[in-house]
């Protein structure tokens, strides 16, 4: 299928296959540059968001965070990606984040599919098949206390 290709659905209606979108919505801290610029976008926005999420998990804040939303948008579009220290963000993580947070969606890690990300050296110790089959044991299981008797916390 190619962008703009029309297919006939089983109910005889025509459907146009699209690979990019133009709508603008999302959490400000996680918006990819192409969204802010009003450009069409692809799945590469999801890889940008993954980069923002991983950055926040490692450092405590999104990479371009600012209390002022307009300043945050400017930073997303223009400011260089910086890291607090190598103690917090090791070199393999820096490389992964730098490539996920590439402002050019065509050069962004993952632009050619998820296998690109899964093969990054940051994930070298992950057996993706084992993960998919849920064969990894968690390093800890939180003791979940539920205030809602109708919900099973497990």
Provide a role label for each language-model segment.
Residues 1-23:
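Activation segment/activation loop of eukaryotic-type protein kinase catalytic domains
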Residues 21-31:
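Conserved activation segment of eukaryotic-like protein kinases, specifically the C-terminal portion
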Residues 34-44:
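Conserved end of the kinase activation segment
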Residues 59-62:
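Structural helix C-cap motif within protein kinase domains
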Residues 77-86:
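Short proline-rich PxxP-based motifs
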Residues 88-101:
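Conserved C-terminal C-lobe helix
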Residues 106, 111-154:
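C-terminal regulatory tails of eukaryotic serine/threonine kinases
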């Amino acid at each position: 299928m190619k962008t703009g290709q029309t297919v006939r659905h089983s109910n005889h209606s025509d459907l146009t296959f699209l690979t990019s979108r133009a709508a603008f919505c999302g959490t400000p801290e996680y918006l990819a540059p192409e969204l802010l610029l009003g450009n069409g976008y692809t799945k590469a926005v999801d890889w940008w968001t993954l980069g923002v999420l991983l950055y926040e998990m490692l450092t405590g804040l999104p990479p371009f965070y600012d209390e002022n939303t307009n300043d945050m948008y400017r930073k997303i579009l223009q400011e260089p990606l910086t890291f607090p220290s190598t103690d917090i963000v090791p070199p393999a993580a820096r490389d992964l984040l730098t490539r996920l947070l590439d402002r050019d969606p065509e050069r962004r890690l993952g632009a050619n599919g998820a296998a690109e990300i899964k093969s990054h050296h940051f994930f070298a110790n992950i057996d993706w098949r084992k993960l998919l089959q849920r064969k990894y044991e968690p390093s800890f299981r939180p003791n979940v206390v539920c205030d809602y008797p109708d919900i099973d916390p497990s």
